[in-house]
Swiss-Prot record:
Its main location: membrane. PSII is composed of 1 copy each of membrane proteins PsbA, PsbB, PsbC, PsbD, PsbE, PsbF, PsbH, PsbI, PsbJ, PsbK, PsbL, PsbM, PsbT, PsbX, PsbY, PsbZ, Psb30/Ycf12, peripheral proteins PsbO, CyanoQ (PsbQ), PsbU, PsbV and a large number of cofactors. It forms dimeric complexes. A core subunit of photosystem II (PSII), probably helps stabilize the reaction center. InterPro entries: PSII_Ycf12_core-subunit (IPR010284). This is Photosystem II reaction center protein Psb30. It is found in: Cellular thylakoid membrane. One of its GO terms (cellular component) is plasma membrane-derived thylakoid membrane.
Length: 39
């Protein structure tokens, strides 16, 4: 637990959250286009 406590988790969570948004955006658009939905 000492190693985890030494790391600053806030920037890691922020980078992970931004990464998920950047990945989820194109995925949602691809799924809508794959289903033939009009944007």
């Amino acid at each position: 637990m000492e190693l985890l406590a030494a790391l600053n988790l806030e920037p890691i969570f922020q980078l992970t959250f931004v990464g998920l948004i950047m990945v989820a955006g194109p995925v949602v658009i691809f799924l809508l286009a794959f289903r033939g939905g009009d944007l």
